[in-house]
UniProtKB/Swiss-Prot annotation:
Protein name: Fructose-bisphosphate aldolase 5, cytosolic
Location within or outside the cell: Cytoplasm, Cytosol
Oligomeric and partner information: Homotetramer. Interacts with TRX3.
Residues making up the signal peptide according to the UniProt record: none
Lineage of producing organism: Eukaryota, Viridiplantae, Streptophyta, Embryophyta, Tracheophyta
Record family assignment: Belongs to the class I fructose-bisphosphate aldolase family.
A Pfam family per the record: Glycolytic
Alphabetized UniProt keyword annotations: Acetylation, Cytoplasm, Glutathionylation, Glycolysis, Lyase, Phosphoprotein, S-nitrosylation, Schiff base
Organism, scientific name: Arabidopsis thaliana
N-acetylserine: modified positions: S2
Length: 358
């Protein structure tokens, strides 16, 4: 089997490799309007376009954060927004060495014939949308598939359906110049132990890479965004070193070394937990052929959001909080995080939401 080599092949490989630079990671700022509304409600801020723009501007203009970031995932609205000075966000990011990306899926819907499992929408007109996003400056994309652990879940139907959806998305992106971030998220919901999560994660990833190969996806021009292997949300917590061992083992068994980087989702962990777990993985003394870094949304933004609280006078304080988290995660990609990236209790607060929708 030979991988697809289109006119963008060299660019895709270069972009994916850059995003996976050790010491850098991705800020996921692609929350849908509905999801950002929930975040705003928690700080009593109205969910209107000007407030969403203000938050994104706060994040994208934070002094000192650019060396810690290689990419930012944007929601479609944000791709076309500007700073208050009139500079497009995309331009601002690119000038500072941060690659703009775009969320392209349209959310999940129930998968008929299953026990509440889901499939992801958005393949219709995806090629045309990718062309538009490329013209607007985006160079990578994200698509989230969601799987759950239960007595009989994930079902084979759900695993295959979601793997094929991710593969079709990935090849369409590559044909149109965007590096696909492949995100098969195994939710933490449930009372299962870490061994169960490891087994399911391995099964899911094996199916995903089989589908990517079947669709001739150029693996060197992709990134993987998986869940960390953890016990279920209703089970006792385990140490970061245990999570690191199970997660890296699952990845070593399933993810080809052609993939340049693995950018973890935080999956409702607290900011501090997510950083400590990433750090433990990078400290693990085993062969890891890919960069292990972050693509965090809630785990980069939560304490920043609280510090800001929608008030202009709090912007500098909120940006300092954001810088602290960015630096902590940058250190974690190198296995050099020493803990306590924020003395703020918000950093240790669980961000778990059952059946999380983006």
């Amino acid at each position: 089997m030979s991988a697809f080599v289109g006119k963008y092949a060299d660019e895709l490989i270069k972009t994916a490799k850059y995003i996976a630079t050790p010491g850098k990671g991705i800020l996921a700022a692609d929350e849908s309007t509905g999801t950002i509304g929930k975040r705003f409600a928690s700080i009593n801020v109205e969910n209107i376009e000007s407030n969403r723009q203000a938050l994104r501007e706060l994040l994208f203009t934070s002094p000192g954060t650019f060396p810690c970031l290689s990419g930012v995932i944007l929601f479609e609205e944000t791709l076309y927004q500007k700073t208050t000075d009139g500079k497009p966000f995309v331009e601002l990011l690119m000038e500072n060495g941060v690659i703009p990306g775009i969320k392209v899926d349209k959310g999940v819907v129930d998968l008929a014939g299953t026990n509440g499992e889901t499939t992801t929408q958005g393949l219709d007109s995806l090629g045309a949308r990718c062309q538009e996003y490329y013209k607007a400056g985006a160079r990578f994309a994200k698509w989230r598939a969601v799987l759950k652990i239960g007595a009989t879940e994930p079902s084979e139907l759900s695993i295959q359906e979601n793997a094929k959806g991710l593969a079709r998305y990935a090849i369409i992106c590559q044909e149109n110049g965007l590096v696909p971030i492949v995100e098969p998220e195994v939710l933490t919901d449930g009372s299962h132990d870490i061994k169960k999560c490891a087994a399911v994660t391995e099964t899911v990833l094996a199916a995903v890479y089989k589908a990517l190969n079947d669709h001739h996806v150029l693996l060197e021009g992709t990134l993987l965004k998986p869940n960390m292997v953890t016990p279920g949300s209703d089970s006792p917590k385990v140490a970061p070193e245990v999570i690191a061992e199970y997660t890296v083992t699952a990845l070593r068994r399933t993810v080809p070394p052609a993939v340049p980087g693995i950018v973890f989702l935080s999956g409702g962990q607290s900011e501090e937990e997510a950083t400590l777990n990433l750090n433990a993985m990078n400290k693990l003394d085993v062969l890891k052929p890919w960069t292990l870094t972050f693509s965090f949304g809630r785990a980069l933004q939560q304490s920043t959001l609280k510090a800001w609280a929608g008030k202009t006078e709090n912007v500098a304080k909120a940006q300092a909080t954001f810088l602290t988290r960015c630096k902590g995660n940058s250190d974690a990609t190198l296995g050099k995080y020493t803990g306590g990236a924020s003395g703020d209790s918000a950093a240790s607060e669980s961000l778990y939401e059952e059946g999380y929708k983006y």
